[in-house]
């Protein structure tokens, strides 16, 4: 049984006849966003590494409230894993993630491959104060990877 919030979102989706889209390339993502912005729509972004949970769901709902268009990135970012951290063991369930995003009214999931996000292995964003504090003390490349991917996502989606 749906709660009232889920019913409201479902009704909203039906009224707008939304079909959530999935893109895997930077080019197709930029093209969609450009078209939405030409129509005068506001675009919000919820960056994730997938394997979504209620915390992500609350961010998607908030983004839905504040924007005409909701883009969710679902990208396991290899640059924020150190050599002793197991990137391959990071949980992934794209089918589950996409079903959740669609149920929450997301308009687009951007699901790129690492080669599309990191075609230039020499360009990074690094904030030294982050790398030296918090978990940066024990995971020295973590924040460089996070800052880089978030910068790239902001550049690709250009959220309002």
Regions found by a protein language model. Give the residues of each.
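Nucleotidyltransferase catalytic core that binds NTPs
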Residues: 21-160
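Short, Lys/Arg-enriched N-terminal segments with co-localized hydrophobic residues
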Residues: 5-19
